[in-house]
């Protein structure tokens, strides 16, 4: 999230929501329009996301989606607000299922499944490796695009095992 945040245009309002201040958007992107929110026991992620939607953001960046707050994040993104978050999974193709499993009820999951493919554009899987000197480095292992064309949800792989596999971008993604 922190790395990709540098590509957000400076005139677009960004709201970051974190429990520990890791993104530090205003420090890494000085002069850009930003409101940083910190959640705690009295002001949780769901409260912060709902509050942020009243502040006319172009972007909502959540440090990590872990639980039921993903429902409010998806609802926010489905209004046209863009966003970024991190979540733990072993394959980008599992992102939709991972999100559905975070939702509190089956009704929420059924209602929001299509929103995942409409509101999310890209999934990126970052892995860690050690080089011969023992230094840890991160690399992009997988990239996919989420799309909803007609009544069908699609995952289009662009990078697999760190290699570009998509030769031509589908028209629906441009």
PLM segments and residue spans:
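Helical/strand "switch-coupling" subdomains that flank nucleotide/phosphate-binding cores, especially
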Residues: 75, 102, 113-139
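NTP-binding/hydrolysis catalytic cores, primarily Walker-type P-loop NTPases
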Residues: 131-174
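Active-site donor-binding loop signature of nucleotide-sugar glycosyltransferases
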Residues: 37-39, 89, 128, 145-148
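Switch/coupling sub-region of P-loop NTPases
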Residues: 5-115
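Short flexible/disordered coil segments
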Residues: 52-55, 75-82, 120-129, 150-152
């Amino acid at each position: 999230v922190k790395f990709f945040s540098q590509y957000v245009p400076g005139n677009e309002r960004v709201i970051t929501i974190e429990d520990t201040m890791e993104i530090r958007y205003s420090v890494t992107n000085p002069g850009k329009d930003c409101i940083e929110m910190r959640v705690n026991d009295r002001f949780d992620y769901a409260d912060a996301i709902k509050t942020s939607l009243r502040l006319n953001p172009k972007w909502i960046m959540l440090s990590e989606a872990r639980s039921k707050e993903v429902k409010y994040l998806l609802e926010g993104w489905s209004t046209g607000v863009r966003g970024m978050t991190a979540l733990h999974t072993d394959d980008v193709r599992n992102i939709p299922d991972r999100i559905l499993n975070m939702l509190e009820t089956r009704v929420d999951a059924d209602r929001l499944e299509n929103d995942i493919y409409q509101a999310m554009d890209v999934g990126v899987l970052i892995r860690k490796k050690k080089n011969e000197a023992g230094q840890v480095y991160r690399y992009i292992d997988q990239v996919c695009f989420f799309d909803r064309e007609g009544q069908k949800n699609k995952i289009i792989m662009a990078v697999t095992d760190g290699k570009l596999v998509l030769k031509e971008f589908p028209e629906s993604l441009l």
